[in-house]
Structures are given as C-alpha cells and as structure tokens.
Amino acid sequence: MINVTERVFLFAIMLFVVCGVAQAQAPGKELPSDPLFKVQGLDGKIYDLAELRGSVVLISFGATWCAPCSTELRALEELLTEYREKPVKFYWVSIERPEETTNAALKRYAKERKVSFPVMRDTGKMVFLQFTPRVRLPMIVLLDKDGKVDAPVQFGMRALADAYKAEMRMRLNKLLATPSDGEQ
C-alpha cells in the first residue's frame, strides 16, 4: 500500500513530467523541417547534418556553467553505450563563445565528464536559435533518419536520471523503428 508521502511524491513527478512535455516546444516557434547544421567540432572536423542521413541524431545543446547540462551529459554517455552498435549519433554543442570558455577549457570539461561523443561549439547560436527563441539549457534535439526534427524539442533534464534515460530510450527506439523515406 502506498502511503500519503509516496503518493504526493509520485504525483509531483508526474506533474513535473507532464508540464515539461507541454512546455517542451517553445510557444510560437515553428521547428525547421530541415535544420541547417554545419558546425566545427573541437576535434577540427566539420559536422554537417546532411551527411548524417540514415542515422538517428541526438544533439544536446549546453554550456559549462549549466549544472543540469553536466548531469544530462552523464545520462547521455550511459545511453550511448546502449546505442553504440546502432545507427544513432550523439553530439554535444556548447553555445558559449570562445571568450567565455576557451577550447582548452571546453575540452577539459568534456574530458572530466568522460564525454566520448563529438563536442562542438555554436558560438553565434545560429544552430541553437533554429529551435528556440531564447536560451534554455540543456536542450535536446532529435532528428530522424531523414534529418527531420522529431518534435518536441526537449528543454532541461526534467526527471531523475533513470526516468530521463527511459524517456530518451523510448524516443530513440521509436525513431530507429521508423523507416526512412528511402527504406519505404
């Protein structure tokens, strides 16, 4: 039997998740059908979404000063181990300018958090602002195998790590199971 404290706690979690999902898409902001994404990674490579067609893509936007971003990166790194053998690509994009956080500091931040997927910088927020008119971090954008945005864009890590990973897992698995235009 669930006591009153447990009921209140479960209700609060459910309300938090429902409100977060309802607010995930920025009001009045229409998502781009084919987002433009050509960003240089800290590894020197240029990452272009057009070249990633055929894979599901998870892009996490964040910043070194964002505490929930750090927690989210740990959760995403754990998810990455589950999807390593599948056509899923993970990326982390810092929205900080070089004068705010140097490349060396950004590399150190990623290394300290054991981030094994590519780290990039969107200094002018040109990619970031395609999905939202204001800064809310962390922000996750999922793209299907055809490079189309899978709405809603998700802001913040709205739940405990296990619940968050379960939600991301559900969305990734749905995208993996959906055939691309070329597979139909």
Region annotations inferred by a language model:
Residues 1-6:
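N-terminal secretory signal peptides that target proteins for export/translocation
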Residues 8-20:
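Bacterial N-terminal signal peptides
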Residues 22-49:
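N-terminal "domain-start" segment that seeds a small globular fold
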Residues 48-70:
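Short active-site neighborhood of thiol/selenol oxidoreductases, capturing the structured segment around
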Residues 58-59, 90, 140:
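Hydrophobic beta-strand anchors of alpha/beta hydrolase catalytic cores
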Residues 70-113, 124-130:
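Structural microenvironment flanking redox-active thiols in thiol-disulfide oxidoreductases
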Residues 113-116, 123-171:
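Thiol/disulfide oxidoreductase modules built on the thioredoxin-like
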Residues 172-184:
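Non-globular targeting/processing and membrane-anchoring segments
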